[in-house]
A protein has these predicted regions:
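Short non-domain terminal segments
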Residues: 12-14, 94, 157
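A generic structural signal for short, solvent-exposed coil/turn residues
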Residues: 9-12, 85, 107, 123, ...
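Mid-length scaffold segments of soluble, non-membrane domains
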Residues: 65-113
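Noncatalytic regulatory segments and standalone regulatory/sensor domains
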Residues: 17, 72-75, 108, 112, ...
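Active-site-adjacent substructure of cysteine-protease-like catalytic cores
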Residues: 92, 96-144
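Active-site-adjacent structural segments surrounding the nucleophilic cysteine of cysteine proteases
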Residues: 2-5, 11-75, 79, 100, ...
Length: 176
């Protein structure tokens, strides 16, 4: 019996070690109407609070973030407001034009990213998602999409098309 258990554990370890992708366990928050930006901020803030073993405070509450930043004119939250909110709450931010390799690099370091997508169903608005995983061998990315679900699997070409329409806008927020 003990030998069998050891074999099973070794086999499981081999299977997990053979997985070429990376995935971060970022909390998922469902968005309110036009609330993808607020939910994305909340997911990333709660992830870092958990990593630092800190209690989640009101600053990481999607409803409060939406109330503070929502623009009726823009039907959501502007990308620059995402950055400012993080900065006001003790985070360093880096907004950049992302590339596929940037996703892998940051995720391997345990850093989730917020990406601006422009799905064809949205005429002029951007849709913010949290990039939580990538599997280059399969050519897929995993998203916490506040409008849909946690760990939404999207093929690279579809993601790149929507990300390109959003000018590859990417936000890295790190606790100070």
């Amino acid at each position: 019996m003990p030998q069998r258990l050891i074999c099973i554990l070794c086999l499981c370890g081999f299977v997990f070690a053979a997985m070429p992708g990376v995935w971060l366990d970022v909390p998922f928050i469902k968005q309110e109407k036009d609330g993808c930006g607020a939910a994305s901020i909340a997911m990333v803030m709660q992830y870092w609070r958990k990593q630092q073993a800190k209690a989640v405070d009101a600053a990481a509450d999607a409803v409060e973030i939406q109330r503070a930043l929502y623009s009726r004119k823009d039907h959501g939250i502007r990308a620059s407001d995402l950055e400012h909110y993080f900065q006001q709450h003790g985070f360093q931010t880096f907004a950049f034009e992302g590339k596929w390799d940037d996703l892998k690099q940051h995720l391997e370091k345990g850093r989730p990213l917020i990406a601006a997508l422009k799905p064809s169903s949205l005429e002029s608005s951007l849709h913010f998602v949290v990039v939580v995983g990538i599997d280059p061998a399969e050519g897929v990315v995993y998203l916490n999409d506040a409008a849909q679900r946690k760990l939404l699997k999207q093929d690279r070409s579809s993601f790149e098309r929507q990300w390109s329409a959003g000018k590859h806008w990417t936000l890295l927020a790190l606790p100070k």
